[in-house]
Amino acid sequence: MARVTNSPASRKRRKKVLKYAKGYFGSKSKLYRYAKEAVQHAWQYAYDHRRKKKSDFRALWIVRVNAACRNAGISYSRFMEGLKAANIALDRKVLADLAVRDEAGFNVLVKQAQDALKTKAASAKKA
């Protein structure tokens, strides 16, 4: 009895991997053995970086808010503490967008944060 190799499915699978590896340099785009490895690494990097992207954006937002805070004469940590004391629940993404697009609106938030810090300090002295 003849050996069954399921050749059409094997060829389709290999062609699919080589299609994913299109644009890779040298043997990684030509030879199935190396293309498969390169594609698997690429998918692993893609998976990891989809998760890393979230922390990268958070860090970018913090840098932008910090720069705007320094221009307004307050440190980032004091600003965030003041927002919390003033019960202003804006996330860093929105704050960064305000800092870049609406400087006047951001300065209003800075003023509110500074006022909340003053009232917090005054209530701490009384207690």
UniProtKB/Swiss-Prot annotation:
<dbReference type="InterPro" id="IPR035566">
    <property type="entry name" value="Ribosomal_protein_bL20_C"/>
</dbReference>
<comment type="function">
    <text>Binds directly to 23S ribosomal RNA and is necessary for the in vitro assembly process of the 50S ribosomal subunit. It is not involved in the protein synthesizing functions of that subunit.</text>
</comment>
<dbReference type="GO" id="GO:0019843">
    <property type="term" value="F:rRNA binding"/>
</dbReference>
<dbReference type="GO" id="GO:0000027">
    <property type="term" value="P:ribosomal large subunit assembly"/>
</dbReference>
<dbReference type="GO" id="GO:0003735">
    <property type="term" value="F:structural constituent of ribosome"/>
</dbReference>
<dbReference type="GO" id="GO:0006412">
    <property type="term" value="P:translation"/>
</dbReference>
<dbReference type="GO" id="GO:0005840">
    <property type="term" value="C:ribosome"/>
</dbReference>
<protein>
    <recommendedName>
        <fullName>Large ribosomal subunit protein bL20</fullName>
    </recommendedName>
</protein>
<keyword id="KW-0699">rRNA-binding</keyword>
<dbReference type="GO" id="GO:1990904">
    <property type="term" value="C:ribonucleoprotein complex"/>
</dbReference>
<keyword id="KW-0694">RNA-binding</keyword>
<keyword id="KW-0687">Ribonucleoprotein</keyword>
<dbReference type="InterPro" id="IPR005813">
    <property type="entry name" value="Ribosomal_bL20"/>
</dbReference>
<dbReference type="Pfam" id="PF00453">
    <property type="entry name" value="Ribosomal_L20"/>
</dbReference>
<keyword id="KW-0689">Ribosomal protein</keyword>
<comment type="similarity">
    <text>Belongs to the bacterial ribosomal protein bL20 family.</text>
</comment>
<dbReference type="InterPro" id="IPR049946">
    <property type="entry name" value="RIBOSOMAL_L20_CS"/>
</dbReference>
